[in-house]
C-alpha cells in the first residue's frame, strides 16, 4: 500500500536482492515503523583484504552484503544474506566459507543470515539480540505499538516481489511523455 511505497524510499541504492532489502528494512527502519532502529547500515561494502585474508580467499577484495557499526564505530558486524540463489552452483558454499573466514581473519564478526531466519519472528529476534551483543549495544523489547508496526511491516515485506506494482494483471510503466504512472499490459 501507500505505506510500503513510502518505506521503499528509505532503502538506499546498492541492494543486490529483495532479501537484502527486507533485511535492511527490518534492521534499519525506526522502531516506530516496525524496524529495529540500527543506524548506519551500509549495503554491499567493498573490503580490501589484508595479505593474510587474501591468502585465504584468493582475492584482493570482497563485498559484505550489510555492514552494521556500533554508534562509536569501534565494532562492526558483517551480515551475509544466504539466499537460495547464493548456493546454486557447485563450489559456491566453499567460496562463501573462504570469504567469511577471510573477513573473520580481519576482525569482522560475521553472521550468515537466511530468509527463514528473518521471516520467523522468534528467530529474527534471536538474531537481533546476537547483533546487539556483537555491537556491545543493549537490546530493548518493543512496545506494543512497535510490535504492531513490525507486524504491519512484515505483512508488506514478505510478499511475492515479482507481483509488486501489478494492478489487475497489468504492470505500471512510465511513459516518456507522461508525468504519472499509467497501467499498461506487459507485452506493450
PLM feature spans:
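Surface segments flanking catalytic/ligand-binding clefts of nucleic-acid enzymes
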Residues: 1-188
Amino acid at each position: 500500500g501507500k505505506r510500503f511505497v513510502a518505506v521503499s524510499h528509505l532503502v538506499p541504492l546498492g541492494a543486490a536482492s529483495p532479501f537484502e532489502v527486507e533485511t535492511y528494512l527490518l534492521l534499519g527502519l525506526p522502531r516506530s515503523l516496525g524496524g529495529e532502529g540500527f543506524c548506519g547500515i551500509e549495503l554491499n561494502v567493498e573490503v580490501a583484504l589484508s595479505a593474510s585474508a587474501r591468502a585465504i580467499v584468493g582475492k584482493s577484495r570482497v563485498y559484505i552484503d550489510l555492514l552494521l557499526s556500533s554508534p562509536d564505530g569501534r565494532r562492526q558486524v558483517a551480515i551475509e544474506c544466504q539466499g537460495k540463489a547464493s548456493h546454486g552452483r557447485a563450489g559456491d558454499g566453499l567460496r562463501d566459507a573462504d570469504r567469511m573466514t577471510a573477513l573473520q581473519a580481519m576482525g569482522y564478526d560475521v553472521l550468515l543470515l537466511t530468509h527463514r531466519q528473518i521471516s520467523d519472528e522468534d528467530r529474527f529476534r534471536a538474531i537481533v539480540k546476537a547483533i546487539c551483543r556483537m555491537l556491545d549495544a543493549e537490546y530493548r523489547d518493543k512496545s506494543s505499538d512497535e510490535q504492531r508496526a513490525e507486524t504491519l511491516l512484515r505483512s508488506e515485506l514478505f510478499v511475492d516481489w515479482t507481483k509488486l506494482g501489478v494492478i489487475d494483471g497489468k504492470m505500471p510503466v512510465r511513459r516518456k511523455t507522461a508525468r504519472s504512472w499509467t497501467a499498461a499490459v506487459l507485452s506493450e
